[in-house]
């Protein structure tokens, strides 16, 4: 059963509520939000752009969750979830379009894939993502999923300098191929990066790492979104204790 999660941001005074996005109308809201975010920030080539939507064949196989502003009624954050059973019917996870995933079949326990996560620019703060994480926790708990996996993006507008610098940090602290190895089907081209070049982790990627997720290999170049996608894997029993409360999990 979905637990209503409402938070009031101390500065803006917004009231936010998590919800399951069931039905065609709610899905269209999610697709419209995705379009606004992805087209504006990545200049992405999106199916459904002529209708102001980001949609694809995976949408109908996924569960969709979101965060709504109770005062305006607007959907302000969303993500979609594809579980192992739906992936079996499809013949693949979405991530397998970009990566060869060695070890996926050997994972012990149910797997949930997260994707198309986006937050409206004016709502990018700890409160909004915490509400979204809380609803994700409900789905994880209900399904008994042991693994959460997906892709996190690094912008490539600078030709890949940020991606290379970010990957240097990720390799040093967050690389783990013990459970799964992700080989990109379209690797980034070689690029010399100065040793002193630093870069901030993109917010969503940082959020995953704080939860305890690991990267499982090198990034894949996504020309449609003009980003480098990094494959991440979060093992349920390795959640960072500091952030485990977002997932209502005992660790």
Curated annotation (Swiss-Prot):
The keyword Magnesium does not apply. Pathway: Lipid metabolism. Its EC number is 2.3.2.30. It holds the Pfam family Acetyltransf_5. It catalyses: a (3R)-hydroxyacyl-[ACP] + L-ornithine = a lyso-ornithine lipid + holo-[ACP] + H(+). SUPFAM superfamilies: Acyl-CoA N-acyltransferases (Nat). One of its GO terms (molecular function) is ornithine-acyl [acyl carrier protein] N-acyltransferase activity. Induction: Induced under phosphate limiting conditions. Keywords: Acyltransferase, Lipid biosynthesis, Lipid metabolism, Transferase. GO terms for biological process: lipid metabolic process. It comes from the Bacteria. It is an enzyme of class 2 (transferase). Belongs to the acetyltransferase family. OlsB subfamily. Catalyzes the first step in the biosynthesis of ornithine lipids, which are phosphorus-free membrane lipids. Catalyzes the 3-hydroxyacyl-acyl carrier protein-dependent acylation of ornithine to form lyso-ornithine lipid (LOL). This is L-ornithine N(alpha)-acyltransferase. The gene is olsB.
